[in-house]
Amino acid sequence: MPESLAERARSTLLKAQVLCREVESRIAEVKDRLSQWEKNRHTLRFLVSCLEHQLGFLEQCALRQGIGRALIETEWSQVVLVDLVNEMKLWYDKIQLRLERLDQVENILVADNKHLSHYISQEQALVLKKRLDEVPIIRPQIENIQTQYDTMCKRVRQKLINKRLTEIKTIFDSQFGDELTETAELTEVKPRDLDSIELELVDYINSLTDHFDKCQALEKGLFNDSNEYDELLKIVSADDSQLDDIMKHLLNTIDSTNHQIDKVYEILDIKTKQKTILHGKINELIANCTKYSEYLAIFKGIATSIEKFKEGCMQDIQLTKELYKFYDEFENSYNKLLQEVQRRRALSQKMLGIIKNCENELKTLHDEDQKLRTHFLSENGAFLPETIWPGEIDDLSPLYALDYHIKEI
């Protein structure tokens, strides 16, 4: 009898082990699928969050702050079209008034009556006029950019954020959200149930193994007395009578487990299809974000052109300021030149007066000298041979010769 009990215990244990091994393999596989699904769900949530932040950055930072406020409202509409234009007009008007002033001042130092404006180049004084003439060209460009900006903001808000992103968030919340009963079922309940089933299967195997070990002990007959043997035989016989029920419960448990696993696979297959569809919508929105981000290059190109225009205007304003100062100094220097002319003329007249006085004194001395020479010759000339002072005794030519030139101013 112990031999038959042991054989029956061995056969039941082997059958149970095979059945449990198969279902445990399926449990391990479905657990992996559940774990992977949870990772995919977190990945989807991360992608949705990234998209939300990216669109928020695109709308608020890149568009409204970076382009709307910083460029269009402040830099272009105010700094360039108002402040810069007003400063160019101010200095253009100033330089024109200075040129008009020079055009009114006649150069009295020359005979053709040219004005001071004739002696300077006026081409550089017109650089701001050329810049101001470009403003009507720049202004429509900025207005066009404003229109494009408004359109882009509207599209980002309505099409990308309000429509596509909202749709994606709604789909995620309705299919993968944390608050869903289905999500709790897949992330908490099912894994916990599968863990319980694994423990239950272990209990089945442990119970059958313990029964098999007792049968082997009876078969080997290693007992000190017959009472111990009889007691164990009684226990083993009672357990043997329950083997069919145990196997029936085990099979029911395995069938129930396989049914649960099949249901989980059905749900996961649906979730996989839902994930694929949602991934497609996410990728489509990412592509749209990339496209709109590339559109920002348009604003960058316009910003570069306007910045070059602004830098050129600032350089021309500085040039005009320097010209204004030069024209002012030019008129001042001309007035000082007139003073210098008067000084030279006065000096020339003074020099001429000195020469005239000198001539008068020399003539007086010469007249007196002529009288004295004539008197000397009348008294002594007949007694002096000419050879004693050849060519000089009876020479009445002046003792001086005065040759001068004073420049007329």
From Swiss-Prot:
Keyword line: Autophagy, Cytoplasm, Membrane
Gene: ATG17
GO biological process: autophagy of mitochondrion; cellular response to nitrogen starvation; pexophagy; piecemeal microautophagy of the nucleus; positive regulation of autophagosome assembly; positive regulation of autophagosome size; protein localization to phagophore assembly site
PANTHER family named among the record's database cross-references: AUTOPHAGY-RELATED PROTEIN 17
Protein name: Autophagy-related protein 17
Membrane is among the record's keywords: yes
InterPro entries referenced in this protein's UniProt entry, alphabetically: Atg17, ATG17-like_dom
A Gene Ontology term for the protein's cellular component: vacuole-isolation membrane contact site
Organism annotation: Candida glabrata (strain ATCC 2001 / BCRC 20586 / JCM 3761 / NBRC 0622 / NRRL Y-65 / CBS 138)
Membrane topology summary: Peripheral membrane protein
Pfam families per record: ATG17_like
Function field: Autophagy-specific protein that functions in response to autophagy-inducing signals as a scaffold to recruit other ATG proteins to organize pre-autophagosomal structure (PAS) formation. Modulates the timing and magnitude of the autophagy response, such as the size of the sequestering vesicles. Plays particularly a role in pexophagy and nucleophagy.
Subcellular location: Cytoplasm; Preautophagosomal structure membrane
Family to which the UniProt record says this protein belongs: Belongs to the ATG17 family.
One MF term in the entry's GO annotations: molecular adaptor activity
Keyword Cytoplasm set for record: yes
